[in-house]
Amino acid sequence: LQKEIIDLKLINEAALEFDLPKINAFDNEIKELGEIKYDFNDFNIACYGFKIKDDIKSKIKAHFISYENSDKNNGFSLLQLNPELSYKMAANIILDAYDSGADFMVVNQAKDFYMFDTCSKKLMQSSGREFKDFYVLSYFEFLSLIQGIKNPSLQNHDLKVSLI
């Protein structure tokens, strides 16, 4: 959609640029799975925009749920142009995961974390629904938790994480 808007010269491309604030959830040394200390047994996990590798799935006991909007555009690219539309798009995705039974969502990109966690209050306002008991983790935070490491970035989440 963003490319189509720019191609049609309906808006200046600079108007769509957004400087993403620093997100500590992606500051992590852990890039791959080590010793498993917490297997997430009985947890339903939603992933947004990527698939968890099969070798990780085989080592933990979590159930990875599928949901309709797992690969849909979350509106980040339109945030500067139309914030309300962006919040509605992101709210539809996170609520789809929530309504599909996920206990939390794992994201692999800082922009996705920003939309789902940092903007969570705006998403709740936009949708008229609460999901304060739902969490969003970066992939690196998730790998850390599997290994029993509580990353300090968990304390900076807008949706407070109290999994372990």
Language-model-detected regions and their locations in the chain:
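Iron-sulfur cluster-binding electron-transfer modules in prokaryotic oxidoreductases
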Residues: 1-164
